[in-house]
Regions:
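A short SAM/SAH-binding and catalytic strip from SAM-dependent methyltransferases
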Residues: 112-125
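Class I SAM-dependent methyltransferase SAM/SAH-binding core
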Residues: 43-45, 51-103, 128
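A short acidic, Gly/Pro-enriched loop at the edge of an enzyme's catalytic core
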Residues: 102-113
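Conserved alpha-helix/loop element of class I SAM-dependent methyltransferases that forms part
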Residues: 23-42, 57
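C-terminal helical/coil "lid" or tail adjacent to the Rossmann-like core of SAM-dependent
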Residues: 10, 16, 199-260
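Conserved catalytic/acceptor-binding region of the Class I
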Residues: 144-212
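Class I SAM-dependent methyltransferase Rossmann-like catalytic core
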Residues: 4-26
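A short glycine-rich, Lys/Arg-flanked "PGG" loop and its adjoining helix->strand segment in the class I
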Residues: 127-142
Length: 274
């Protein structure tokens, strides 16, 4: 499977999905980008860059950085070029390229850093993608990989339709050749392909009455994420409309419950080339 192609990506494509991805990047920015080790990097590789939402944050955070992004979906690539190209302060600081993470078209020792975010969950052979990334990096270059661990999702009040939908969501991603639990495997994957100084950190999102504003924002984002796969799941026969309607009702109830709790955790892995 190529990197983030139309077969392995169940959220759909188009303007609504582009807007959702940009909103998602803004909401989780402080949980991902706060301490990235790219201060000394000048040529960064980003694999599976989608609509360029993470690319924009990287370029804003590191003003001396040039990012070469690789994306397999032509629609996403066009959206990234359009959005980033419309911002004069980014002129000359990025190259948005069409390519396959399984076979990167760059010579060895091209880049001095790499960033991957929410991409390995969508590919059939994440070790191969990471091996290709390592090949293109100079010795001592940092790599950061952010990935999902979908088994961690918890919602209170208890929401059986939502959990049933979530199970079908993950099962279908497996059927498409992806892995919704790849975050827990990043240490093994990075070690297998020869990276050194590997560190993994579980980054939890626990939102309750102490953070009502952020909880409300995250629940809106999470509802959009779930519904982005609705058409694909119904079409594949993985869920029925009754389950979807039940989930929507539960999510509305959770959003107005004064004691609602949302929990999810992803994994950020860091390593270096030897």
């Amino acid at each position: 499977m190529s990197t983030r192609d139309t077969k392995g990506y169940l959220h759909g494509f188009g303007e609504a999905e582009e807007a959702r991805l940009r909103r998602q990047a803004r909401i989780v920015e402080h949980r991902i980008h706060g301490t990235l080790p790219f201060r000394r990097c000048r040529r960064l590789l980003e694999v599976g860059s989608g609509v360029g939402a993470q690319t924009e944050i990287l370029l804003r955070t590191f003003p001396d950085l040039h990012v070469t992004s690789v994306e397999a979906a032509e629609g996403n690539l066009a959206a990234a070029r359009r959005h980033l190209g419309a911002q004069p302060w980014l002129n000359g600081r990025f190259d948005a390229t069409h390519g396959d993470g399984n076979a990167l078209e760059f010579p060895a020792d091209t880049f001095d850093g790499a960033f991957l975010c929410w991409i390995l969950e969508h590919v059939g052979d994440p070790a191969r993608v990471l091996s290709e990334v390592r090949r293109t990096l100079r010795p001592g270059s940092p790599v950061v990989v952010n990935e999902v661990q979908n088994a961690t999702f918890f919602l209170s009040p208890y929401s059986p339709c939502t959990l049933r939908y979530w199970g079908a969501f993950n099962d279908h991603q497996f059927a498409l050749g992806g892995d919704p639990f790849v975050g827990a495997k990043l240490g093994n994957l990075l070690q297998r392909v020869g990276f050194a100084d590997i560190e993994t950190e579980v980054r939890p999102v626990l939102l309750d009455n102490r953070h009502p504003g952020e909880r409300a924002e995250f629940l809106r984002f999470w509802t959009d994420l779930l519904l982005s796969g609705c058409e694909e799941l119904i079409g594949a026969g993985k869920v029925d409309t009754e389950t979807v309607e039940g989930m929507q009702g539960e999510l509305r109830d959770v959003a107005t419950d004064p004691d609602a709790v949302f929990f999810y955790a992803f994994v950020q892995a860091r390593a270096r080339t030897a």
